């Protein structure tokens, strides 16, 4: 297991050299969605603790390594940091450790969600992913549906195309229609086949991004900290966690600003005129009040 201590003491992830172009995959999504089981399917071994229940087993970020067709793969599993109730005193540490394990940045973020169960919690998880990693993170996102076996005779494309879940349709569009499905109980040829399908999507994504990975200021800070070497008890680590808090807050503000701008763009012209008219009315009322106050002061005081 690739622990945080292995990383902070200068160990290289999986013993990979820079020339081997290791693929870094970050698992994201709401608690209990099957991230750990998906990680095990990716690595084709029980690397992460996984149980068949709707609650998260993973308590801290964990990285495991494997290979696919000769290429080294680093898979990072995440604790419950992508939900509104996850705001607690350990949040900064959980996010900071996730950045450290995935530095200098992930090539792919796998958003794991259960087939036919994309709920408000999943929508919140997507928003939290943007807050934690920045608004540009969707450029490197692939949606991965678990419970592929539930499709029965229907194809995944049919399911996605004809779903009446608007939030899911919007997400798929935002991710450039990059999606696939896993049966995490599969083995042998079935497991190999679904993994090959995902890796084909990964190659397409890497071509679109010209081989780049997702990065931001916080990943640069994490990389610097790793390069310098440190202890989790040192002042440098505490300063890093303070930076985590600042950067996530900044990214949250940028997301809210972007959403506000988007709302104005998609408002119908009539609605925009209503907003403008409403603002004008308020200014008119304010101007009249000021006039009467000035008139009263001028003639009666």
From Swiss-Prot:
PROSITE patterns associated with the record: G_AIG1
Q: Which UniProt keywords apply?
A: Endoplasmic reticulum, GTP-binding, Membrane, Nucleotide-binding, Transmembrane, Transmembrane helix
InterPro entries tied to this protein: G_AIG1, GIMA/IAN/Toc, P-loop_NTPase
Q: Name one GO molecular function term.
A: GTP binding
Q: What induces it?
A: By BCR-ABL oncogene.
Please give the start and end residues of each transmembrane region: 280-300
Tell me which domain of life the UniProt entry assigns to the organism this sequence originates from: Eukaryota
**Region feature Required for targeting to the endoplasmic reticulum, mapped onto this chain:** 263-301
A Gene Ontology BP annotation from the UniProt entry: mitochondrial genome maintenance
**Tissue specificity note:** Expressed in thymus (in thymocytes), spleen (in splenocytes), lymph node and, at lower levels, in lung. Highly expressed in T lymphocytes.
Q: Which GO terms describe its cellular component?
A: endoplasmic reticulum membrane; mitochondrial outer membrane; mitochondrion
Q: How does it assemble?
A: Interacts with BAD, BAK1, BAX, BCL2, BCL2L1/Bcl-xL and BCL2L11/BimEL. The interaction with BAX is increased, when cells initiate apoptosis upon IL2 withdrawal.
Similarity comment text for this entry? Belongs to the TRAFAC class TrmE-Era-EngA-EngB-Septin-like GTPase superfamily. AIG1/Toc34/Toc159-like paraseptin GTPase family. IAN subfamily.
Role noted for this protein: During thymocyte development, may support the positive selection of CD4 and CD8 T cells. May play a role in mitochondrial DNA segregation in hematopoietic tissues. Binds GTP.
Q: Protein name, please?
A: GTPase IMAP family member 3
Q: Which organism is it from?
A: Mus musculus (Mouse)
The gene designation is Gimap3
């Amino acid at each position: 297991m690739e622990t945080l201590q292995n990383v902070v003491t200068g160990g290289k992830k999986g013993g990979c050299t820079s020339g081997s172009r290791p693929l870094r995959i970050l698992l994201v999504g709401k608690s209990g969605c099957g991230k750990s089981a998906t990680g095990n399917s990716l690595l084709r071994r029980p690397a992460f603790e996984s149980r068949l229940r709707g609650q998260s087993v993973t308590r801290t970020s964990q990285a495991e390594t494997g290979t696919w067709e000769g290429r080294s793969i680093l898979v990072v599993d995440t604790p419950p940091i992508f939900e509104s109730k996850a705001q607690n005193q350990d949040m900064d540490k959980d996010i900071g450790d996730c950045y450290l394990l995935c530095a200098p940045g992930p090539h792919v973020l796998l958003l794991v969600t259960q087939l036919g169960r994309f709920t408000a919690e999943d929508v919140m998880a997507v928003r939290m992913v943007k807050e934690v990693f920045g608004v540009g993170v969707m450029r490197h996102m692939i949606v991965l549906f678990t419970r592929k076996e539930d499709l029965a005779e229907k194809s995944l494309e049919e399911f996605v195309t004809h779903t009446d879940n608007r939030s899911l349709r919007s997400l798929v569009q935002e991710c450039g229609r990059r999606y696939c499905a896993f049966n995490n109980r599969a083995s042998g040829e079935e497991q190999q086949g679904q993994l090959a399908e995902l890796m084909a999507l990964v190659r397409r994504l890497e071509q679109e991004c010209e081989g780049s990975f997702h990065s931001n200021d916080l990943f640069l800070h994490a990389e610097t900290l790793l390069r310098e070497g440190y202890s989790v008890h040192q002042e440098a680590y505490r300063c890093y966690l303070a930076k985590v808090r600042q950067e996530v807050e900044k990214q949250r503000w940028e997301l809210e600003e972007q959403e506000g701008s988007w709302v104005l763009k998609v408002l119908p012209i009539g609605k925009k005129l209503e907003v403008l008219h409403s603002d004008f009315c308020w200014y008119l009322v304010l101007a009249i009040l000021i006039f009467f106050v000035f008139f009263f002061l001028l003639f009666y005081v």
